[in-house]
Regions:
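Positively charged, small/polar-rich N-terminal and surface patches that mediate targeting and assembly
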Residues: 1-115
Length: 115
C-alpha cells in the first residue's frame, strides 16, 4: 500500500478533484489546510534581510492565494496511477507553476481501514 500525499495550491479545483477521484472508486481522502514556508515568511516577515530575500521570489508567489490543501490517501498500489491521472486531469497538469505537488510513501502497517 501507498500513502499518496498531494499539496494542492490550486484549491479552486478541490471539489472537482474529489469528484474525479470518487468516479475512479478512490475514496477516503483526508484534507488538511496548509501553508508553505516561503508563503508564510513572505506574509509575516518584518526582518529587512528576510524581506529582501523573499522579494526576490515574490514573482513565484501569489500573496493573495488562500491556504493550500494537503490531501492524504491510503491507496492500493494499483490505484496510484489512476489517482495521479485524476490530479493531472483536474489541475491541468502539475508541471504548471503554483498548481501543486504529489508523491507517495510506502505504508508498512495500517489498521482501521477496510479496502
Amino acid at each position: 500500500m501507498k500513502l499518496l500525499i498531494m499539496i494542492l495550491n490550486k484549491v479552486d479545483v478541490l471539489e472537482d478533484l474529489l469528484l474525479e477521484l470518487a468516479n475512479r472508486q478512490i475514496k477516503g481522502a483526508t484534507i488538511l489546510s496548509s501553508t508553505g514556508m516561503a508563503h508564510t515568511l513572505y506574509n509575516s516577515s518584518n526582518d529587512q534581510e528576510a524581506s529582501f530575500f523573499l522579494g526576490s521570489i515574490r514573482t513565484l508567489l501569489n500573496p493573495e492565494r488562500e491556504e493550500s490543501k494537503t490531501i492524504l490517501l491510503v491507496l492500493k498500489e494499483e490505484q496510484v496511477s489512476s489517482a495521479v491521472e485524476a490530479v493531472e486531469k483536474v489541475t491541468g497538469g502539475l508541471d504548471k507553476p503554483d498548481t501543486g505537488i504529489v508523491f507517495t510513501l510506502p505504508v508498512d502497517y495500517i489498521k482501521g481501514i477496510v479496502f
